[in-house]
């Protein structure tokens, strides 16, 4: 298990992360989300031992990570700002990785290079942004690490490459019990990938939860009746965002699905649809309850709404 215990990291007079605590179970995919400047990258770098926390502890199975080569030999970190040796080719980078990570799997490396159609002898500096991301992921996954840390790694990848890389991560988690921590400013990017999510805003933890728990017992409902009614008809339920147009009402409800069906069916609807909420919709509700504005924390763009 990885633990952050009351971790604070500052840069001069700027508090990048403030008293952050979380527990990351072994063999899970853990997401950190937040807007630009929320502290995601700083938290991840502190987690990896790139930065030293001024306060608190970062522990891997009770072992501190900072300046600990025994821990760091089991982890691979891909920064949002990729770095490769000047003029190095994928083949040359693989030789370097093999020296650092003895379990580096050349067979897997060649297979993944071939899949992405990356020239093993060409300078990585001449690659496009997406190809550089692919190369970084090929090298990282070929190391077969115990811990994989990804900072905005899916940025710049096309949908096909993104889906394939996610499948590789899933397989390594399932087969080798690899622990993965990934940051993103997009909930939608992580919704189908992560087991748990941590939301950061201005360096502080807003919310941490298992995705399954977040989505459980939250639904959106569309219902219609052939008689006149108002919101009071649903007083037996805990509902949010109620809207009524003509005879049709839409709202969000927090309750068990079977209870919602039983209560609403007893009122003789002519239309009843009960659908699960998206992760974004659940976060909106949870954050509103905590007094936060979802759009401010995640910087949701108009074309993403």
Predicted feature residues:
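The feature captures the beta-strand-to-loop junction immediately N-terminal to the Walker
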Residues: 30-35
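Conserved ABC transporter NBD signature motif
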Residues: 56-71
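ABC-family P-loop ATPase nucleotide-binding domains
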Residues: 79-135
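Catalytic Walker B motif of ABC-type/P-loop ATPase nucleotide-binding domains
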Residues: 148-152
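ABC transporter nucleotide-binding domain
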Residues: 165-255
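C-terminal coupling/interaction segments
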Residues: 247, 252-305
């Amino acid at each position: 298990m990885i633990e952050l215990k009351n971790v604070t990291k500052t840069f001069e007079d700027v508090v990048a992360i403030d008293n952050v605590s979380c527990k990351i179970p072994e063999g899970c995919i853990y997401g950190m989300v937040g807007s630009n400047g929320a502290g995601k990258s700083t938290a991840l770098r502190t987690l990896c031992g790139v930065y030293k926390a001024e306060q608190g502890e970062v522990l891997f199975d009770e072992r501190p990570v900072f300046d600990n080569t025994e821990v760091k030999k089991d982890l691979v970190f891909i920064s949002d700002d990729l770095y490769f040796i000047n003029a190095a080719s994928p083949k040359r980078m693989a030789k370097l990785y093999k020296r650092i990570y003895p379990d580096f799997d050349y067979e897997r490396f060649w297979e993944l290079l071939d899949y992405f159609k990356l020239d093993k002898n060409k300078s990585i500096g001449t690659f496009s942004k997406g190809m550089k991301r692919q190369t970084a992921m090929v090298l990282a996954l070929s190391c077969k690490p115990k811990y994989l840390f990804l900072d905005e790694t899916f940025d710049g990848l096309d949908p096909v490459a993104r889906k394939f890389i996610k499948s590789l991560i899933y397989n390594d988690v399932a087969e080798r019990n690899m622990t993965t921590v990934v940051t993103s400013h997009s909930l939608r990017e992580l919704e189908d990938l992560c087991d748990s999510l941590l939301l950061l805003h201005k360096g502080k933890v807003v919310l941490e939860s298992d995705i399954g728990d977040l989505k459980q017992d939250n639904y959106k409902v569309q219902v219609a009746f052939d008689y006149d009614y108002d919101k009071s008809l649903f007083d037996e339920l805990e509902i949010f965002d109620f809207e009524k147009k003509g005879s049709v009402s839409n709202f969000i409800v927090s309750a068990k699905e079977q209870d919602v069906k039983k209560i609403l069916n007893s009122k003789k609807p002519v239309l009843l649809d009960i659908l699960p909420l998206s992760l974004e919709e659940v976060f909106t509700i949870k954050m509103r309850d905590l007094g936060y504005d979802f759009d401010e924390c995640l910087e949701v763009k108009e074309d993403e709404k």
